């Protein structure tokens, strides 16, 4: 994916996007506080 690709912030894609507090790889892992 290039910088011109726009995607919504998703917790689980291993990328920390704007608006995300964590991105640990999977939605389950991201629920760990």
UniProtKB/Swiss-Prot annotation:
GO biological process terms, semicolon-separated: proteolysis
Additional comment: Negative results: does not cause hemorrhage in mice with doses up to 50 g. Intraplantar injection of moojenin (50 mg) into the rat hind-paw does not cause significant edematogenic or hyperalgesic effects.
Cystine connections: 11-30, 24-30
Binding site for Ca(2+): 10, 13, 15, 17, 20, 23
Cofactor note: Binds 1 zinc ion per subunit.
GO cellular component: extracellular region
Gene Ontology molecular-function annotations: metal ion binding; metallopeptidase activity; toxin activity
Subcellular location as annotated: Secreted
pH dependence: Optimum pH is 4.0.
Organism listed in the record: Bothrops moojeni (Lance-headed viper)
Lineage of the organism: Eukaryota, Metazoa, Chordata, Craniata, Vertebrata
Recorded superkingdom: Eukaryota
Free-text description of this protein's post-translational modifications in UniProt: The N-terminus (from the N-terminal region of the metalloproteinase domain) is blocked.
Description of how activity is regulated: The fibrinogenolytic and coagulant activities of the moojenin were abolished by preincubation with EDTA, 1,10-phenanthroline and beta-mercaptoethanol.
Keyword Secreted: yes
Family the entry assigns: Belongs to the venom metalloproteinase (M12B) family. P-III subfamily. P-IIIb sub-subfamily.
Swiss-Prot/TrEMBL cofactor(s): Zn(2+)
Disintegrin domain boundaries: 8-33
Protein's name according to its UniProt entry: Zinc metalloproteinase-disintegrin-like moojenin
EC number: 3.4.24.-
Functional note: Metalloproteinase moojenin: snake venom metalloproteinase that cleaves both alpha- and beta-chains of fibrinogen, but not the gamma-chain. Shows a coagulant activity on bovine plasma about 3.1 fold lower than crude venom. Renders the blood incoagulable when intraperitoneally administered into mice. Induces necrosis in liver and muscle, but does not cause histological alterations in mouse lungs, kidney or heart.
Tissues in which the UniProt entry reports expression: Expressed by the venom gland.
Summary of temperature dependence: Optimum temperature is 30-40 degrees Celsius.
